[in-house]
Amino acid sequence: MVKQAVKVFVRTRPTATSGSGLKLGPDGQSVSVNVPKDLSAGPVNNQQEQFSFKFDGVLENVSQEAAYTTLAHEVVDSLMAGYHGTIFAYGQTGAGKTFTMSGGGTAYAHRGLIPRAIHHVFREVDMRADKMYRVHVSYLEIYNEQLYDLLGDTPGTSDALAVLEDSNSNTYVRGLTLVPVRSEEEALAQFFLGEQGRTTAGHVLNAESSRSHTVFTIHVEMRTSDAASERAVLSKLNLVDLAGSERTKKTGVTGQTLKEAQFINRSLSFLEQTVNALSRKDTYVPFRQTKLTAVLRDALGGNCKTVMVANIWAEPSHNEETLSTLRFASRVRTLTTDLALNESNDPALLLRRYERQIKELKAELAMRDTLSGKGRVSYDDLTDDELRELHATCRRFLHGEAEPEDLPADSMKRVRETFKALRAVHVAIKADMATQMATLRRATEEGSGAAARGGDSAGPSGVGDVDLRATGGFTVGHAPLDARPPVRSELGSPGAGASGAEALGEPRSPGGGLHAQASSHTDAGSNWGDAGPLSSPGGTRLAGIFGVSGDRNAVFRRYKVDVGEGRELAASLKAASIALADTKASIRSLGASVNDAKQRIDELSSALALRRGATPAGGDGEVLDSEAYALMQELKSAKSRYRTDFDSLKSAREELEPQIQAVAVARAGLLEAFDRWAAAQSDTTLKRMATAGRAMSGIAPGEEDEMDAGEQFERMQIARISERDPDSLAFHTALKRTGAAVSRPATVATGGNAKAAAMATRKMEHTQAVNRGLAR
């Protein structure tokens, strides 16, 4: 890890007042604030008037582009190199924090750090063609000490969100939506969509004051390539827009806005306490006091490259707020973070890395053996046949039938296996000796007992007695002619060779391919442009006006073009039909591929069987020539291809039925909407649309939707923007896409949560103020 100091920059809001008391040093890094003495304190007044601060830079009357170059360019470059980064704006309300981070509305030249950082990231992605990148974005809001997901499907809920730590002590928000984006336009569209869900309110100092803290995060995953995907570098950039601190006696807020100001000031106060504890190097740092400090834990003292923007409003009436902001910024500048490269700890990636390293080490061993004049040495694990042969060699060695040179010693693996085999054979021999000794003792005891009883009859085993006095020893008896010692099995019997081919999934259906099932489905989307039978009230009315079905279909065609509801439903039906057709085509293609792979497997299996039958086997087992080996490799590849195509075919079949149902539902919905519309129209309107619809009969399918005047204007506007500034095309396109979308606050207001209640309370307070004549 590398110690990295937190950089702090000051950005001033332009002001028309000349005698503001704020002076900038000639070095561009120092700031002096002159606070006049309070004359009401009396003649003895030791109040300090001059305050000086030094930072990493001061931005006064600079453009948004210059601000981005100074504040964020280096951080984004570090992000692309695999390091975490955070940029947060701090200051009083109305000082320009949101303008610095997000920008000035729809003006492209006034876009803030977030849109410019998105453009920078995707420009670097396009330039680095030798690497593979995946980019995700998330947008978090902290409102009244509650977390909200501004990009989630249900942004009104916050119960599932929680700030946690991973195994590397990095903070993350559980349950926060990560949206994958593939282009600058998609990322900007998500940002603009999240902006619509932010909570704002107006007061005397700011007409659109942010009532919450927001964190827009860009997550970047970098790999060297798809083939060599064993190393992944993960990094993220947090772009934080803090709500402004307020003096309620100046803003004059009441009711719900006052409550929000209290939460904002409380969270910023705890943030200041956390910074003070870090600057003093206390053993305990209160990161968990608020959601804001928990989210900013890495930015203040963890693995992150952090930049702070202190926004100040250099007006004489705001000297106290300016001085407070500069003091906080000077304390933040004393902090340091531990910067380290962030590599993924995914077990799958580690497995790929270890496999590659093992392969490289084996190649190096083979090269060393070749250079040292050794023969081909195998460093792989021993097979079952090799283990059985090794045990037999060790047994012969212990019985004195083999020499030490017969034991393998060409690699450490074989030496270890030899010692294991020697131990196993020794244990087995020892067990045999123990069994034989037990048998001898039992026979001796039985013989001694029979001699003591003086019996002269043969025992159950047919072994006679011998006079101990005549032999001078112990009796062992006479073994019968059919007696033999038990045969002890070897450590393992040679197994039978592999027989039969592998099971290759389901066989082909006779008379048809694997795609026969797909082709048997009814093409529910092939005739999606026909009005169908009109037996409902609207259809009955159309049948009464028009005698032939062609006129009814003509009205139906115009309904899909001229009526907004019909145009949307027809587009949905067309999209569902196209998706269904693509799935069917994919099933047919995959079915043919599976059948071809199965046929190729059968051919290769037969050829390999013939080759094995024609090649005599050696004494130690089968010896494969180059042609048989090539057939085996090709057979293995064919089986792998068969399994891949078969799994894809199975997945496509599972998607087919839901898509057929989707086409049927879309078609039924279109016909039902057309029926309702036709029942409510006049005869003149229907006849006019029938005439226009008959004129469309010569138009080819897919060419019915001609551009209207508005669409032509948009096309011309996009072309003009592309000619003037190609880099701004993504910004304007994303802004247009999200501008036509449904506003997020309306969705949030129905969520039944704290934000919805706050919006309802603020609306009620505004209504009461209007009734009392205090507002408009």
UniProtKB/Swiss-Prot annotation:
Coiled-coil ranges (or none): 348-371, 579-657
GO cellular component, one term: cytoplasm
Ranges where the Kinesin motor domain occurs: 5-335
Keywords: ATP-binding, Cell projection, Cilium, Cilium biogenesis/degradation, Coiled coil, Cytoplasm, Cytoskeleton, Flagellum, Microtubule, Motor protein, Nucleotide-binding
Compartments in which it is found: Cytoplasm, Cytoskeleton, Flagellum axoneme
GO biological process terms, semicolon-separated: cell projection organization; microtubule-based movement
Molecular-function annotations in GO: ATP binding; microtubule binding; microtubule motor activity
Domain of life of the organism encoding this protein: Eukaryota
Region (Disordered): 441-535
InterPro entries: KIF6/9_C, Kinesin-like_fam, Kinesin_motor_CS, Kinesin_motor_dom, Kinesin_motor_dom_sf, P-loop_NTPase
Biased composition (Low complexity): 447-460
Transmembrane domains' residue ranges: none
Primary site of residence: cytoplasm
SUPFAM superfamilies for this protein: P-loop containing nucleoside triphosphate hydrolases
Span list, region Globular: 658-776
Binding site for ATP: 91-98
PANTHER family cross-referenced by the UniProt entry: CENTROMERE PROTEIN E, KINESIN HEAVY CHAIN ISOFORM X1
Family of the protein in this entry: Belongs to the TRAFAC class myosin-kinesin ATPase superfamily. Kinesin family.
Protein task: May play a role in rotation or twisting of the central pair microtubules of the flagella axoneme.
Designated name of the protein: Kinesin-like protein KLP1
